Amino acid sequence: MKDLLNLFNQQRQTLDFDAIKIALASPDLIRSWSYGEVKKPETINYRTFKPERDGLFCAAIFGPIKDYECLCGKYKRMKHRGVVCEKCGTEVTLAKVRRERMGHIDLASPVAHIWFLKSLPSRIGLMLDMTLRDIERVLYFEAYVVTEPGLTPLERRQLLTEEQYLTARQEYNDDFDAAMGAEAVYELLRTIDLQSEMTRLREEIASTGSETKLKRLTKRIKLIEAFLESGNRPEWMVMTVLPVLPPDLRPLVPLDGGRFATSDLNDLYRRVINRNNRLRRLLELNAPDIIVRNEKRMLQESVDALLDNGRRGRAITGTNKRPLKSLADMIKGKQGRFRQNLLGKRVDYSGRSVITVGPYLKLHQCGLPKKMALELFKPFVFAKLQRRGLATTIKAAKKLVEREEAEVWDILEEVIREHPVLLNRAPTLHRLGIQAFEPVLIEGKAIQLHPLVCTAFNADFDGDQMAVHVPLSLEAQLEARALMMSTNNILSPANGEPIIVPSQDVVLGLYYMSRALENKKGEGMVFANTSEVKRAYDNRVVELHAKVKVRITQVDVDTVDGKRTSGTSIVDTTVGRALLSEILPEGLPFQLANTEMTKKNISRLINSSYRLLGLKDTVVFADKLMYTGYAYATRAGVSIGIDDMLIPDEKKGILTEAEAEVLEIQEQYQSGLVTAGERYNKVVDIWSRTSERIAKAMMDTIGTEKVENAKGETIDQKSMNSLYIMADSGARGSQAQIRQLAGMRGLMARPDGSIIETPIKANFREGLNVQEYFNSTHGARKGLADTALKTANSGYLTRRLVDVAQDVVITEVDCGTTEGLIMTPIVEGGDVVEPLKERVLGRVVAEDVYLPGNDEEPIVTRNTLLDEAWVAKLEDASVQSVKVRSTISCESSFGVCARCYGRDLARGHQVNIGEAVGVIAAQSIGEPGTQLTMRTFHIGGAASRAAAVDNITVKTTGSVKFNNLKSVAHASGALVAVSRSGELSVLDGHGRERERYKLPYGATITAKDGDAVKAGQAVANWDPHNHPIVSEVAGFIRFIDFVDGVTVIEKTDELTGLASREITDPKRRGAQAKELRPIVRIVDAKGNDLTIPNTDLPAQYLLPPRSIVNLQDGAAVGVGDVVAKIPQEASKTRDITGGLPRVADLFEARKPKDPAILAERSGIISFGKDTKGKQRLIIKDTDGSEHEELIPKYRQIIVFEGEHVTKGETVVDGEPSPQDILRLLGVEPLAAYLVKEIQDVYRLQGVKINDKHIEVITRQMLRKVEITDQGNSKFLNGEQVERQRVIEENARLVTRNELPAKYDPVLLGITKASLATESFISAASFQETTRVLTEAAVRGTRDNLRGLKENVIVGRLIPAGTGLAYHAGRRKASGLTDSEMETLSGKPAVVEPVATVADAGADEE
């Protein structure tokens, strides 16, 4: 008996391992795996269905077909275990060994492994320092290669043609060896002395000067180093023994009708064996060379096809013209082993069905059809039936269940009680796509879903299906309940706002009951409490919308100690709102609900409830809100009819005015006063303005109605028009949609994004005519096509993001860094789009924050997690910028620390150790991807047709403050800006910044620093269509190189009669004017050159082409006067890439087409001699050294001679390249740039994503550094290495007093970064599997299984969340004290108990 137990344990034993290493297999190793040589191409005997001896399915090699039974049937049963049958050679054992036992084929001639030959860069080629073309000529028998030159003048590795070879043989007899085919390559590789080759290369690197040679040498050195370190031998890249896959992994299945279905691999193996046997026979017969060569080449080709079909030449096809699936195809791609079987498995105990709405469910429940539940929980039901004695055996229990006896249902009820199930809706774009619920048994066949979780699942009830999964083990049930229960996921992990928010009908009901209307029955009554209101309402004494006074009892909960104090007050409210106050939880102030309940306000209400009262109360409250909303939506009876679409009376008049304007422009165009482009733009402008006017008139018509109030006066009030109610409450529809129903449809876009200038004047109520209908379908069709493409693109972006960030996990509490990002409010066009409080909420402060102007007592100390209370404090103290910790500057060696990450957005307290923040970040950015647009906006599209801004009008009252503004005082008393980066802020009474504006060069500023301004006051203005050149000194103008008709053209304005000069384009000037450069110089009365104040540069201004000078030679100019102006037309026609493509471009760190050119250093600008198509820009820095930049003539240079620029400032207009920002400004500005640009795209679509998610991805893009000076390290110059490796190596060198390596950060796009990860398993399962595995095998890479993906692939718990403790325990047990594991085991890495999750309002340290 003991033996038997041992036997079972033996079978269950798995290898325990800590890492996986991949390397080249030596012939001896392959033979050691093998259980015998496959000699025949036969598979099975088609009459007996038994495998042929020595064939591809041979039982003697691979093991028996039936458990414990040899092939001929001599030995059967367990007692003969381990016996080898002398008749048929089969070992008596389990049949499943056919899945693991390998065979081998001894190749009659060596064969080069195609991966190491053809996968670029060719490893064999690098090793031999030969080109791929040459090696292929040798391999495929087109040329000889010299393997051993002996004393002859021939070179080793020299190629010889047939004739050259014969000549050489005659000349030198047998003094040299040359051969062709894989033998030759094998011989060359075998004879390489790696060590001496290495020394030779290092010497060569030291002496070489050429860049390209250096690159090639570094590559070779790296390869040879890899071979030396990994213990691989170069000749193993050429195979002499071929391993054969176990037969059960390439099955052969008999179909009915005597045919067989077989894996393609069998065909490929058969081909190899046939050719190999034929070659062997030919060699024994000493066949002619040419025949043998041909056979060898065919063998090479068949092995190539087996390993990677189609990599070289045409793919070998089967009977049906379809390429055969080779070993490489088995593992790569979406259907390959990695993505199909290892990362995505099908699971047992699951089912799927259509979903319907369950409005009576509680938030933590879902309705599960009885039939499904019975099937899913079968084993549990069986067990319980047995335990109760209702069935004696499992079989009997099965019968009971099949008959569906009455007691079965009772037991099912018990089994299901408090056993959560997981519901999942595909596509699962973020973690809220799978949530746990407690099942409630229902009749019918559809799953019932709680309406409030629909937003998270993105589900609707038009036929969506959902899958149900049953967590079986106790641990799984615990995790489902504590972490995945729908009640624990009230906040969205993307932005920390509630995601359990009522929508549609519920909003409509709540909005309806909370509206206030004039002069309704019972207005002005006073009630003692809410129950009195309810009685009055039920008895129809008051109407729902009547304005009344009610005495309301409020409970105030202290956020610190939770003390409750109650007080009463009489409140002006309405009957509906008083009824609503009954469902408010204790401690939520009534004024939050005493307003119109639009969707925004409801969201705010739920948010406040969560922050003030915690999880439990909020969940109950959300459910009550839903029930109430549904009830009153039913009572409201809101529905829309065609008469609700009121068309404004003014529409006709507005249209007539617009048509007259368009006609006028048409006439101007015909008389040549405006160009075609201007006409188009102006017409489009007129129509978009008209559209807005009609929309406004329509909203006034629909949104207001005239009523009599209680005093009998007629007043306006918000109307109860059904259409308006729906849009205003946020239940359904928007102003833009109503405008199409009742205003005018307006301008339509063509499929390329440009705008059709004839608008659609009708609306849907009036109906469209044929032309209008056609115009509107034209652009709409593109929209539908886009939607389909968008989903795929968005999914691919998410996949890349998850892959790059999958191993970012919180591994420690604090890494101790003092670095961070400085946060300021985000301002766009003067408006604060994101105030400071929103940006720093949930972040940890990196250094103490003081009151502005007071450095004694910090308001917030370092390492404080800023929650709502702290943020309010900062705002009261009117702090303008805060340095916060960020994952970008986190110094944890693996993963990131909790302090640098800050608050867990979905829970509202500091993030736990083990949280997989990388994946959460990827999901938060990828999930809204489908909402982004796909199109590229062309300027001239309505989307971007904002009228040009030409002044700054402040919106708030306060005082003016200038930031880094350089200005000169004009004679008129105003200031003129002469810097580009100047900004003007308006501060309120507390010194808080309320608005901020950019001041363009040449702006006239009418306010001074510190002036008081009133709201609506204009403080600066400029000409938006011209870029001025402003004089910084007073004097007289002198023209230089102004040659009429050559460099300038005189023009006289027809209307004003004034003369002006326009500078011509240098391309059109002809040869004699090549050296001429038109300059305006300013001189004093005596004609001496003046200099720019505080510099020794002459006051002169180089005039770019197309600039216009209105002054005459010798005219007097004052300080701040405009000398010349450049029309701003051409530089503005850049297309704006928007939406998803823009986000992808930023994450892939692609260089823009015409990137902005940034100043390489700080200094003074001057212009040197131009070359043919380029201008020469020189920056002279403080120590006098100069830096030159050649800039194409067509680019817009936005700096002037003599201007001071700082390093990294834009000197040529364009889109900055992220690589430049990193190189010139560093990591923090790059992070700020990426965050800002990506947020801009999402903000345009109204999607909120927290900055920290983008920062996590940016951190991963900056993982690698480039070595600039190797010092005494093991790295090479120019090598890209993981940052952490360099830091560790440098720390090691410093302790030994050796020179550390110097490095620069490198920015990689997310695809590159994923492929460059340290784990080859993770990279191979992402993209370019062949390349990754080839590279890894050559280096003998070891994968330490640290990321999430690798652990999923090898079938372990992931090292995140609850799995972190398991991994820490494993490492401890195996005696591996990894540095990061010490930090982990020191701190408890367990999931918080449920209790703390529930009351996690406080900041837990």
Swiss-Prot record:
SMART domains documented for this protein: RPOLA_N (SM00663)
Annotated positions binding Zn(2+) 1: C70, C72, C85, C88
GO MF terms, alphabetically ordered: DNA binding; DNA-directed RNA polymerase activity; magnesium ion binding; zinc ion binding
Enzyme class: transferase
Positions contributing to Zn(2+) 2 binding: C815, C890, C897, C900
UniProt KW keywords: DNA-directed RNA polymerase, Magnesium, Metal-binding, Nucleotidyltransferase, Transcription, Transferase, Zinc
GO cellular component: DNA-directed RNA polymerase complex
Subunit structure of this chain's protein: The RNAP catalytic core consists of 2 alpha, 1 beta, 1 beta' and 1 omega subunit. When a sigma factor is associated with the core the holoenzyme is formed, which can initiate transcription.
Protein name per its UniProtKB record: DNA-directed RNA polymerase subunit beta'
Gene name tied to this protein: rpoC
